[in-house]
């Protein structure tokens, strides 16, 4: 059984793939050699099912950044984090943001951690208010 951290990391790779291939969440998940853990599948399906709304939130709360111009890894992480904030109310805001920042620092650009933190904090202020 994967930890939530591992599930988020796996979901990041799959959400990146989802966009790169232009496939649905179910198509990406079906291509895996073994079924993912439940939380990974929840995140990937959540991002796939709510992508338009997630991108609307990201566009609304990002200052001077069009969603399509964000680095692809950041975009995938932000969609996952925004999904968790909006559809997983039992998760503490700090955990969602911290996990996304750690993954951004590990897999994206030098400035991504700060960007991901600031944007998810703005979204959390609205979604969890």
Where in this protein do the model-derived segments appear?
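N-terminal interaction/assembly modules
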Residues: 1-129
């Amino acid at each position: 059984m994967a930890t939530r951290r591992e599930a988020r990391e796996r979901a990041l790779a799959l959400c990146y793939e989802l966009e790169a291939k232009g496939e649905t969440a179910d198509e990406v998940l079906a291509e895996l050699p073994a079924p993912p853990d439940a939380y990974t599948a929840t995140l990937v399906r959540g991002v796939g099912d709510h992508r338009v709304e997630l991108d609307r939130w990201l566009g609304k709360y990002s200052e001077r950044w069009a969603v399509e111009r964000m680095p692809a890894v950041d975009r995938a992480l932000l969609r996952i984090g925004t999904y968790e904030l909006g559809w997983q109310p039992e998760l503490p805001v700090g955990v969602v943001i911290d996990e996304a920042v750690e993954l951004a620092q590990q897999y994206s650009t030098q400035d991504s951690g700060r960007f991901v933190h600031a944007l998810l904090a703005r979204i959390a202020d609205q979604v969890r208010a």
